[in-house]
Amino acid sequence: MTDRQTKILEIVNQKKKVEVATLSKMLEVSQVTIRKDLDALEELNFLTREHGYATMKNMSDISNRMAFCYETKQRIAAKASEIVSDGETIMVESGSSCALLVKQLSETKKDITVITNSSYIARFIRESEGGVTKVIVLGGEYQKEAEVMVGPLVKTCAEAFYVDKLFMGTDGYIPGIGFTSGDMLRVEAAKSMMGSARNSIILTDSSKFSEHGVVMQSKFKDIDM
């Protein structure tokens, strides 16, 4: 994604609905160029094209959440990938930064196995390069908008495995206390996966430090990185 496309996402996110002509003026490029950028962003499932304008999608959709702070999340994913070795099996919980980590591993590592409760991440891997050679999807109740499995079956499935690293996302952070979420079922799924990993690692950008979810996800002392 180009710098201009990132800027377009920021503008559309702020305004929710923006005309092509307005974007053209703001970014000082032709409307033809803007339309091409919008087509590319729609192909990535980051926004919706309508006649003459663009709108953001439902923010509970992981593809749309990925659009926020995209470049920052890419850098986080690249840094996290450095602690994963070729041939390693890891667990990856749902989240936009987690999806970008898996994409990074697909492009830079070899023979990686990913265990996840996210059908989105499983599909995301399919569209990436071949560094991730095996995907194991934990069963459970399917949450359609987040494309993630939750419920007691996630715990049952996770207990069959034990890995060195679990990568998780988060919805918010309370200083001195820990990480929070807005969904109790997803928190329970994450805790089940934490029980099957030696190290639990949070992937998040700084915007989450100003957000406070209503459900406690994990105490700070329970996170290794």
Put a short name on every predicted segment.
Residues 9-12, 19-23, 28, 43, ...:
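Conserved phosphate- and dinucleotide-binding cores of soluble alpha/beta proteins
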Residues 57-59, 95, 138, 170-171:
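Generic beta-structure capping elements
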Residues 97, 115, 132-134:
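Conserved N-terminal glycine/acidic-rich loop preference
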Residues 117-120:
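Active-site catalytic microenvironments in core metabolic enzymes, especially phosphate/sugar-handling
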Residues 2-17, 21, 26-27, 32-94, ...:
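HTH-adjacent hinge/linker in prokaryotic transcriptional regulators
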Residues 78-81, 85, 99, 103, ...:
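Amphipathic, non-transmembrane alpha-helical secondary structure
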Residues 95-98, 207-209:
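Short beta->alpha connector loops
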